[in-house]
Amino acid sequence: MDGEDIPDFSSLKEETAYWKELSLKYKQSFQEARDELVEFQEGSRELEAELEAQLVQAEQRNRDLQADNQRLKYEVEALKEKLEHQYAQSYKQVSVLEDDLSQTRAIKEQLHKYVRELEQANDDLERAKRATIVSLEDFEQRLNQAIERNAFLESELDEKESLLVSVQRLKDEARDLRQELAVRERQQEVTRKSAPSSPTLDCEKMDSAVQASLSLPATPVGKGTENTFPSPKAIPNGFGTSPLTPSARISALNIVGDLLRKVGALESKLAACRNFAKDQASRKSYISGNVNCGVLNGNGTKFSRSGHTSFFDKGAVNGFDPAPPPPGLGSSRPSSAPGMLPLSV
């Protein structure tokens, strides 16, 4: 009743019925609790009787174990006396056998020493063999990597040479476009001053110049295709006689500026690749003239490997890792930076 809210009653009969129902509910709960208590008491008495029976059995088993323990102690004493007697007899026999054993041990030590020397020599030979095999595999792997890297660099150099041609052609085309734009602007100014009533013809001339700049390719063409660019004079106006808007003219000029920026980026990248190729060539000549050492075994025996170390660096042969290649020039093909022309031609 502490947590329940007492409702409001409209009549005395409703209040009486409510309290009567509540009392019946509490009476039923009390009856259930009393039944559970009686059941719990009966279970407790049964458990207590069972535990008492187990206690009696445990005490009986403990007494039996104590009796067995006492009997085993007597047997141990008898066995100790018998063991001492046997030990005295065996000691005499052991003293006689030890003399024979000392002689056989001396012979055995000599044989063991000889066997250890043979095993050590065998281990040294096997270790030298494994080191030789591992070194040979490492040398072959590095040789293959060097060959692949050199082939890749040679292909890159070929691409750079073709890019030089394309870059020079782009420069020439851009220079021609700038000159032609300047000439046409001057012609347009002269025409505007001489004939101010004909703006449509001037617009058409400017549109043809802008269309010529729009027709230039943004990247060099690939190998096997003719690396030629159409002359601005030979490019037709794709819009017919309709003039271009000022935004189209600005876009065309922006394209020309982008071409010039890309050409400059290609020149800087080509210079870096040339410097790296020169470094690789000098490094290869230094390695081929200095690396010719072999692998030493455990006894100091030298195995000459001059025929396998001529293509590897001196640090790898002496047990040190070679210097890593410069960033961006690993086994995978480097990607072009954003806003630059691709290297493939």
From Swiss-Prot:
It holds the Pfam family NUDE_C. The keyword Coiled coil applies. Residues 114-133 are annotated as: Required for interaction with PAFAH1B1. Residues 315-345 are annotated as: Disordered. Residues 28-190 form a coiled coil. Residues 195-256 are annotated as: Interaction with KATNA1. A lipid is attached at C273 (S-palmitoyl cysteine). Residues 256-291 are annotated as: Required for localization to the centrosome and interaction with dynein, dynactin, tubulin gamma, PCM1 and PCNT. Phosphorylated in mitosis. Can be phosphorylated by CDK1, CDK5 and MAPK1. Phosphorylation by CDK5 promotes interaction with KATNA1 and YWHAE. Palmitoylation at Cys-273 reduces affinity for dynein. Residues 189-256 are annotated as: Interaction with YWHAE. GO terms for molecular function: alpha-tubulin binding; beta-tubulin binding; identical protein binding; microtubule binding. The modification Phosphothreonine is found at T219, T245. Signal peptide: none annotated. It is found in: Cytoplasm, Cytoskeleton; Cytoplasm, Cytoskeleton, Microtubule organizing center, Centrosome; Chromosome, Centromere, Kinetochore; Cytoplasm, Cytoskeleton, Spindle. Belongs to the nudE family. Interacts with PLEKHM1 (via N- and C-terminus). Interacts with YWHAE. Interacts directly with NEFL and indirectly with NEFH. Interacts with microtubules. Self-associates. Interacts with DISC1, dynein, dynactin, tubulin gamma, KATNA1, KATNB1, PAFAH1B1, PCM1 and PCNT. Interacts (via C-terminus) with CENPF. Interacts with ZNF365. Interacts with GTP-bound RAB9A; the interaction may lead to RAB9A-dynein motor tethering. Required for organization of the cellular microtubule array and microtubule anchoring at the centrosome. May regulate microtubule organization at least in part by targeting the microtubule severing protein KATNA1 to the centrosome. Also positively regulates the activity of the minus-end directed microtubule motor protein dynein. May enhance dynein-mediated microtubule sliding by targeting dynein to the microtubule plus ends. This is Nuclear distribution protein nudE-like 1. It comes from Homo sapiens (Human). The lineage of its organism: Eukaryota, Metazoa, Chordata, Craniata, Vertebrata.
